[in-house]
Amino acid sequence: MNYGAADERWANPPQPVAAAEHGPSFDHSMVSEEYEHDKKKNPAQKEGISFSQALLASGHEKSDGKIKLTARSFMEVGGYAVFLIVLVYVAFAQNSIQSYYYSKVMSDLFVASTGASGAPAFGSCTSMDNIWDWLSQVLIPGIYWTETSNSTDNENMIYYENRLLGEPRIRMLKVTNDSCTVMKSFQREIKECFANYEEKLEDKTMVGDGSVDAFIYATAKELENLKTVGTIASYGGGGFVQRLPVAGSTEAQSAIATLKANRWIDRGSRAIIVDFALYNANINLFCVVKLLFELPASGGVITTPKLMTYDLLTYQTSGGTRMMIFEGIFCGFILYFIFEELFAIGRHRLHYLTQFWNLVDVVLLGFSVATIILSVNRTKTGVNRVNSVIENGLTNAPFDDVTSSENSYLNIKACVVFVAWVKVFKFISVNKTMSQLSSTLTRSAKDIGGFAVMFAVFFFAFAQFGYLCFGTQIADYSNLYNSAFALLRLILGDFNFSALESCNRFFGPAFFIAYVFFVSFILLNMFLAIINDSYVEVKAELARKKDGEGILDWFMNKVRGLTKRGKRPDAPGEDATYEDYKLMLYRAGYAEKDINEAFTRFNVTSMTEHVPEKVAEDIADEVARMTEQKRNYMENHRDYANLNRRVDQMQESVFSIVDRIEGVNATLQTIEKQRVQQQDGGNLMDLSALLTNQVRNRESAARRPTITSIADKKEE
């Protein structure tokens, strides 16, 4: 059988259309009417692109406006996917849930535990006496375990599994007694003044004869310490240090008792820092513990616990070789990207940096280079510190440099991962549906910038009001920084209304209601309106554009190709039945309802019969005719809807103009009426004046004869 006459129809099947019972859709017509005349009545099926064509293609735009997939874009997506996998492995290989559990166990032991004789927990210390009790009843028992295990020598071991590295250190920083000035009115009663901590106000004077190291000031260089950041201030690395023995709780208790008896912590003390390090061989993790007591000039104690867990011996484990391989691949990618960016900048000069995604690439490379440098530094620092601790016999273990290098590395690594995932939007935006987010943000950037200024004015006005009005009584408003974040939390529903009300029964509720009204109800809804307006515009604009063929389109075409949907159907063989031919037509893209109607018109009752050549051609013609008829109906209906919408818009415009004309006419009539009234009032005044003058003239004329007669009589 020869089906050559139907080959052209099969090679160029129509696009599937919606069933007639669903009715025409007006959604698309409402947003794409300006370009409806450019659409073809029977557009050809979107051309596909093979894998080999994708590799060999060059960037070009087809005559119908569709952008074809290029070799550069395909290779770029594939290469970046591999880079992202490598980056994620490098970033997360050294992080595990064990790090959290390790920190939590140590926190429960030293921070949350209370003393056997009623000593408060670390966070509950509020006075100097509480600090002494915590040191003797919580810290010492936690570090020195007296119970023994049959299979483990637990000397220097915490929980039988954590080795104590070096001597625990208790460091105290103090200020001089003349670091501030007492007011003259109180100088007779108050002789000493201790200011808040500043490094220039530190008291470095030796206490007593200096026979005990804890009473001799040691510099930061001698202790190998860095600054410690607290809640109130940042404290220097020096201070008066009491080293506890590696083993022996009795000696440690004796040292604490000696310090307490000699009033080692006094009025001038501003910080007590306890630091030590642990190593767990089971999970190959180090835990650096730093517990800070701050003693502000106002009195009391502010506690800050810091427990940081690190993997300092990554390359010495079973997965160390694999980690080195992935890090080497990561460095290779970064080197390739750097050369690529340099060539691009050389071609385009500074204009290259005007594109958003190019700036993202530059930032990503900058963070990546910094990560590589910091990774080398933290590895070198960690290994050197561990070797140093082992060489000195586990007596001295300052880990501040390790903590600093590790934190810097982790922070920059987090930035690299974040920017790398943001860049994924660059590739998924090749499809117009996926590009709506980025296009919406780009279009609304100017409006959001203006909104941000207005929001900042309102926000910081409320923040300053809260700080000034409630700062002395509510912790959330104790400073401007806390006040700003308290207001941000209020937007999310996290607030303490009772505290505001108890602080000020008038301004508290008024402040809360005003902030919720202006910020939550007005400003946030304005922000959503800006985003929504931009999204509607972007969606309408993208609906008017013709579909391009990007990475996602190429992938979906391959998936459709696997199911043979949208492909040219093979001509039915001699043994093909009506059921087979129906399936071929359906796979070619025709609507199932049109196929069934065509089969019904040709009185096809048995689907197992063979398809004659003539009947096959007639059925194909009928299905194509019905599909084309429906498409024309849809196009005409869409044109009618667009025309109807435009007429409605014109009507609204005309009615608006008429309303404005009527308003102007009413205004003119009012003005004319006022002018006439003013003119009538003026005429009445003129008439009244004229009548008054006439009356006066008549009265004068009437008086004259009388006066004349009187004068004549006098003369006589």
From Swiss-Prot:
**UniProt tissue specificity:** Exclusively expressed in a subset of 3 categories of adult male sensory neurons: ray neurons, hook neurons and head cephalic (CEM) neurons. Expressed in the male tail.
| Residues on Cytoplasmic side | 1-72, 346-355, 431-447, 532-716
Query: Where are the Phosphoserine modifications?
Result: S534
Q: Where is this region: Disordered?
A: 1-44, 696-716
Record-level GO cellular component terms? axon; ciliary membrane; cilium; dendrite; endoplasmic reticulum; endoplasmic reticulum membrane; membrane; neuronal cell body
Disulfide bond entries: C180-C193
Coiled-coil region: 613-680
Q: Which domain of life is it from?
A: Eukaryota
Q: Which residues lie within the membrane without crossing it?
A: 483-497
Record-level Gene Ontology MF annotations: calcium channel activity; calcium ion binding
UniProt feature, compositional bias: Basic and acidic residues: 1-10, 30-41
Q: What happens when the gene is disrupted?
A: Worms exhibit defects in 2 aspects of male mating behavior: response to hermaphrodite contact and vulva location.
- Membrane-traversing stretches: 73-93, 325-345, 356-376, 410-430, 448-468, 511-531
Please outline how this chain is modified post-translation: Phosphorylated. CK2 (kin-3 and kin-10) and calcineurin act antagonistically to regulate the phosphorylation state.
Q: Which Pfam families match?
A: PKD_channel (PF08016), Polycystin_dom (PF20519)
Extracellular compartment spans: 94-324, 377-409, 469-482, 498-510
| UniProtKB keywords | Behavior, Cell membrane, Cell projection, Cilium, Coiled coil, Disulfide bond, Endoplasmic reticulum, Glycoprotein, Ion channel, Ion transport, Membrane, Phosphoprotein, Transmembrane, Transmembrane helix, Transport, Zinc
**BP-aspect Gene Ontology terms:** calcium ion transport; detection of mechanical stimulus; male mating behavior; mating behavior; neuronal signal transduction; regulation of male mating behavior; response to hermaphrodite contact; vulval location
Subcellular locations according to the entry: Cell membrane; Cell projection, Cilium membrane; Cell projection, Cilium; Cell projection, Axon
User: What does the record give as the function of this protein?
Assistant: Functions as a calcium permeable cation channel. Required for 2 aspects of male mating behavior: response to hermaphrodite contact and vulva location. Acts in the same pathway as lov-1 and atp-2 in response behavior.
Q: Spell out the family assignment given in the record's similarity comment.
A: Belongs to the polycystin family.
Please quote what the entry notes about the protein's domains: The transmembrane domains are sufficient for localization in the cilium. The cytoplasmic tails are necessary for localization in cell bodies and anchoring at the ciliary base. Cytoplasmic tails also regulate sensory function.
What PANTHER family does this protein map onto? AT14535P-RELATED, POLYCYSTIN FAMILY MEMBER
Name this polypeptide is given? Polycystin-2
Give the originating organism: Caenorhabditis elegans
> Which taxonomic lineage is given here?
Eukaryota, Metazoa, Ecdysozoa, Nematoda, Chromadorea
